[in-house]
Every structure is written in structure tokens, then in C-alpha cells.
Amino acid sequence: MKKIITGAGLILFLAIAIVSCTESEARIADEAKSTEVENETPVTNASMIERGAYLVAVAGCHDCHSTKIMGPMGPQPDPEKLLGGHFGGPATEKVDPALIEKFALFNHATTMAIGPWGASYSANLSSDESGIGNWTEEQFINALRKGKFKGLEGGRPLLPPMPWPNVAKMTDQDLKSIFAYLKSTKPVNNVVPPPTPLEELVKK
């Protein structure tokens, strides 16, 4: 009888120990989860804009989407027209087709490029209505994920030298941050011309 009681007591002790350990582990997990939440930086519009400005800078978006003025070290983005796209109208000079077979041609502001696709002009990315002022976030992400003009399913493809296949690899949060930043920029009123077909550019 004593052995039976001792065995029952041992089983009861083990059961209490298991429950206690389980509760302790659950409490530790809850505390760790709580600490993680406390340590996470909340995503705010201000932090997204800051992140977007950083991404636009390191991705070199100003290289093509900001027209240039001549500085002491050469062309530099015009601070009054940042991200306003191509100024100056479409290409008018005729180009030797043999040259296009070997090179891509750029204007001095690097906002216009000529190649086998014709002439392409850098888009206005500022917050103005002539830029992306009326765009939705979904449009913006769709444009860069699928390479579609204005993010429209039936739109024409984005033309070189826009490196959208590279940008498409960014995370959704990165693209949303870039969009938030662009929407916060100074509006630059500038309607960029549509692409010029190659046949209109080559010398006959």
C-alpha cells in the first residue's frame, strides 16, 4: 500500500512539474514577444518618407529624373526642378543609324536617351499633377513590378534606360516608402513628351 501511495505521489509531482514548466515557458515566450514589440520601430509616414528619400538617393533616381545645371564639377541636379523629368521637348535632330547600333546616346542632362527603341524621356516623378500627383500607391508599385507606363495593365512598357527589372526586386515596403517620399516632394509642373519612334530620328 505504501509503494502504491509513493508511486501516486511521484506521478502527481511530475504532473505538477510539467504544468509549472509549461506555464513558465509560456510566460517567457510572452515576455520575449512583448519585448520584441516594444523594440520594433513603428512605421510612420515620416519614417517612410525618410526611408524613401534614402532609397531614391542611393538608387540614383536623380541621375535621369532630375534635369541638370552646370556646376564646378560638371552637371548636377537642378534644385528647383528635382525629379521633374525631362525638360526641353522631344528630340529633333536626326541620328546616324550606324551610331545607334553601337551606342546609346544621352543629352547633357541625362534625361533623354536614344537607342534602338527610339528616344525615351525621363518621367516627372514629382508630386505635381503632371508628375505622379494623381497616382495611387497601387499604380506606382504595379509600374515598377511589371514595367508598365503609369502602372496601367494596358499601358506601354517602360523603355530603357529605366532599370525597372532591378527596382522590381525591392520589397513592397521599400516601394511604398519611395512613393511616400515622392508624394512629399516639391511639385514641378512639367509635361514630359511621349517617346519618339526610331524611324522619326534616323537619317534617311
Residue ranges and their predicted role:
Residues 33-57, 69-75, 94-95, 134:
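Electrostatic cytochrome c docking/interface patches
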Residues 70-141, 158-171, 201-204:
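Gly/Gly-Pro-rich "capping" loops immediately C-terminal to redox-active cysteine motifs
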Residues 17-20:
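C-terminal motif of bacterial Sec signal peptides marking the signal peptidase cleavage site
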Residues 1-9:
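Bacterial N-terminal signal peptides that target proteins for export
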Residues 22-24:
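Bacterial signal peptide processing site
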Residues 52, 58-68, 140, 178, ...:
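The canonical Cys-X-X-Cys-His
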Residues 134-149, 164-194:
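C-terminal capping alpha-helices of c-type cytochrome domains
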Residues 49, 62, 155, 161-163, ...:
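Interaction-mediating elements
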